[in-house]
């Protein structure tokens, strides 16, 4: 008990540090716009990213002089605080990005303090950063489970809920007021985080701040798993003390369902403890228990969202499905658990008999419809799958056109390399080759048949050369086939995102 109390005091020690003065420090903005720490921001329009030390000094000087740090984005008749409109937008973005770095500091310190030397090395492992690391986990664990909850995590109903949840971790009132000021003054931001687009952050200008807020929201949503795990295993984990701030949720829950103590709620989930995975706004929770247990989980999820986040969740956000009769639509794959029956003949002395073995097998495949739709938007082919030339690329050289189509094919091959059935992937790549041929034939004002006849087999090899070289380094020579194609299953552990696999930049 003394160790638990000491850990709680350690966690609370950084909460009383004042973060607000850091917004007046120059090095904070250096961290915010460093290429290594802010890659997502640098993917946007480079013209608007002209920052310098002189600009930062001017911004800090104006922050000392002005009573307000930011202005309303929708008020056209307001007084100009930072001068020219372009500078106002620049300063506004600099403040928000700097503030995002500031609020990340306490959580980074908490993570570092909670890890020992071995775990720090594991965190730095590039393999664990790959989203493909989820699928080997599914293959190992989901084979022996019965039911799965297909969960769509609800979006925050109101921005004030995010500020209130952050208040339990961050005790600096000035920083919280500044965050609230950012969220409410810039009214056009409110739709960013309370809408469906908040998951991708593809077009959000201040995506780092909103990404932090959404990740913190999801972290709070997942925090009760630790409580249930500790209650189930009867272990006194030190992280349990940091979660005692959520006690007000159970107080609300008591009045809702007339439960006298938390132990009555937690005893529903003692055994068996389920397996949980999440990517972006979708989560899977699978268990070996019965259908009744999964309905209790669903009931707990809905009550948790309503009481803690004041979110009235719709029933269609949680589906209860049986793994043997259901395909999981997760991270661009259709995964399922199927029974493979096999008959084995065994002979002992003069007696022979047949044994029927029915093992479970985890299958995953790339769905053809979403892939076709994602490539139909940038006009690689029609919605019906008919290839059309990429007319905007006709001004490029032949090698650049082939290289762009080849990179798209290789990206798709890398991501869907773990598919059990690659027939759909081969169809997609075949249509991409025809689309590339149409683009080149349109550029040279020729027919597709004549162009393919002139290029020969070299044109097809451009789409598989890099993939074949990579596989030859990690697989024995026996696995190599003609044309560089490998029909086995390989999970690439260097993929950390999926949003740019198709829309090649």
Swiss-Prot record:
Keywords recorded for this protein, A-Z: Chloroplast, mRNA processing, Plastid, RNA-binding, tRNA processing
Entry-linked Pfam families: Intron_maturas2, MatK_N
One MF annotation (Gene Ontology) recorded for this entry: RNA binding
Chief location: plastid
Subcellular location: Plastid, Chloroplast
Gene Ontology biological process terms in this record: mRNA processing; RNA splicing; tRNA processing
Family: Belongs to the intron maturase 2 family. MatK subfamily.
Role noted for this protein: Usually encoded in the trnK tRNA gene intron. Probably assists in splicing its own and other chloroplast group II introns.
Matches recorded under PANTHER family: MATURASE K
Name of the protein in its database record: Maturase K
Organism: Gomphrena haageana (Haage's globe-amaranth)
Gene assigned in the entry: matK
């Amino acid at each position: 008990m003394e160790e638990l109390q000491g850990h709680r005091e350690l966690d609370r020690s950084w909460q009383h540090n004042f973060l607000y003065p850091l917004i007046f420090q120059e090095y904070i903005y250096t961290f915010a716009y460093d290429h290594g720490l802010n890659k997502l921001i640098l993917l946007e329009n480079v013209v608007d990213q002209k920052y310098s030390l002189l600009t930062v000094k001017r911004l800090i000087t104006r922050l000392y002089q002005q009573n307000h740090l930011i202005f309303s984005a929708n008020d056209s008749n307001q007084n100009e605080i930072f001068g020219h409109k372009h500078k106002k937008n620049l300063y506004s973005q600099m403040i928000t990005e700097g503030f995002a770095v500031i609020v990340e500091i306490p959580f980074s310190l908490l993570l570092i303090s909670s890890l020992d030397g071995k775990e720090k090395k594991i965190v730095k492992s590039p393999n664990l950063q790959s989203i493909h690391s989820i699928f080997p986990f599914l293959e190992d664990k989901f084979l022996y489970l019965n039911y799965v909850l297909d969960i769509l995590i609800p979006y925050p109903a109101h921005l004030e809920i995010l500020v209130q949840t952050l208040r339990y971790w961050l005790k600096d009132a000035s920083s919280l007021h500044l965050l609230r000021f950012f969220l409410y003054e810039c009214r056009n931001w409110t739709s960013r985080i309370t809408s469906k687009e908040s998951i991708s952050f593809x077009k959000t200008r201040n995506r780092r701040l909103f990404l932090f807020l959404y990740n913190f929201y999801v972290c709070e949503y997942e925090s009760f798993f630790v409580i249930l795990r500790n209650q189930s295993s009867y272990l006194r984990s030190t992280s349990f003390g940091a979660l005692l701030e959520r006690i007000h949720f159970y107080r609300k829950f008591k009045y809702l369902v007339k439960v006298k103590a938390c132990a009555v709620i937690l005893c529903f989930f003692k055994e068996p403890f389920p397996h949980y995975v999440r990517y972006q706004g979708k989560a899977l929770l699978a268990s070996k228990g019965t259908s009744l247990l999964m309905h209790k989980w669903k009931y707990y999820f809905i009550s948790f969202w309503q009481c803690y986040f004041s979110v009235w969740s719709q029933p269609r956000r949680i589906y209860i499905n049986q793994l043997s009769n259901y395909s999981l639509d997760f991270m661009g794959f259709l995964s399922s658990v199927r029974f493979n029956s096999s008959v084995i003949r065994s002979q002992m002395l003069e007696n022979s008999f047949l044994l029927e073995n029915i093992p479970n097998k985890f299958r995953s495949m790339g769905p053809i419809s979403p892939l076709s739709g994602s490539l139909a938007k940038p006009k690689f082919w029609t919605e019906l799958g008919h290839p059309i030339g990429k007319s905007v690329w006709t001004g490029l050289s032949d090698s650049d056109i082939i290289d762009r189509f080849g990179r798209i094919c290789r990206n798709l091959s890398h991501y869907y390399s773990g598919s059990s059935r690659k027939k759909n992937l081969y169809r997609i790549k075949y249509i991409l080759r025809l689309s590339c041929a149409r683009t080149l034939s349109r550029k040279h004002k020729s027919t597709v048949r004549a162009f393919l006849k002139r290029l020969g087999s070299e044109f097809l090899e451009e789409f598989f050369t890099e993939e074949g070289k990579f596989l030859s380094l990690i697989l024995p020579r026996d696995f190599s086939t003609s044309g560089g194609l490998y029909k086995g299953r390989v999970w690439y552990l260097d993929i950390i995102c999926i949003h740019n696999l198709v829309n090649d930049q």
